[in-house]
């Protein structure tokens, strides 16, 4: 399992399917955002005074993230996206 450092967040992106003429095109489109599930969260980031600022998201949250943000990584057969918390736009409720 991946354990992110600092203000980084590990996400599992929800793949969207688009149908065109009866064919399913996985991941099609040029959306500006992606929906993802938070898998793991770093401890946060420290201020110049050394105070720890906790992340705004937690494991199992569903979030909206910028589509081109982060780095795709593999852990075994699973693909994850590691982003900075600042790339997360909103928590989906």
Swiss-Prot record:
GO terms for biological process: chaperone cofactor-dependent protein refolding. SMART domains: Cpn10. Pfam families: Cpn10. InterPro entries: Chaperonin_GroES (IPR020818), Chaperonin_GroES_sf (IPR037124), Chaprnonin_Cpn10_CS (IPR018369), GroES-like_sf (IPR011032). It comes from the Bacteria. It is found in: Cytoplasm. SUPFAM superfamilies: GroES-like. Its main location: cytoplasm. One of its GO terms (molecular function) is metal ion binding. One of its GO terms (cellular component) is cytoplasm. Keywords: Chaperone, Cytoplasm. Together with the chaperonin GroEL, plays an essential role in assisting protein folding. The GroEL-GroES system forms a nano-cage that allows encapsulation of the non-native substrate proteins and provides a physical environment optimized to promote and accelerate protein folding. GroES binds to the apical surface of the GroEL ring, thereby capping the opening of the GroEL channel. Belongs to the GroES chaperonin family. HAMAP family: CH10 (MF_00580). Heptamer of 7 subunits arranged in a ring. Interacts with the chaperonin GroEL. This is Co-chaperonin GroES. It comes from Streptococcus constellatus.
């Amino acid at each position: 399992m991946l354990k992110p450092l600092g203000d980084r967040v590990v996400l599992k992106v929800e793949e969207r399917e688009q149908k065109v003429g009866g064919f399913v095109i996985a991941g099609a489109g040029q959306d500006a955002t992606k929906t993802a599930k938070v898998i793991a969260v770093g401890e946060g980031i420290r201020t110049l005074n050394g105070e720890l600022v906790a992340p705004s998201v937690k494991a199992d949250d569903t979030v909206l993230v910028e589509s081109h943000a982060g780095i795709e990584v593999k852990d075994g057969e699973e693909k994850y996206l590691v982003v900075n918390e600042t790339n997360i736009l909103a928590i989906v409720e």
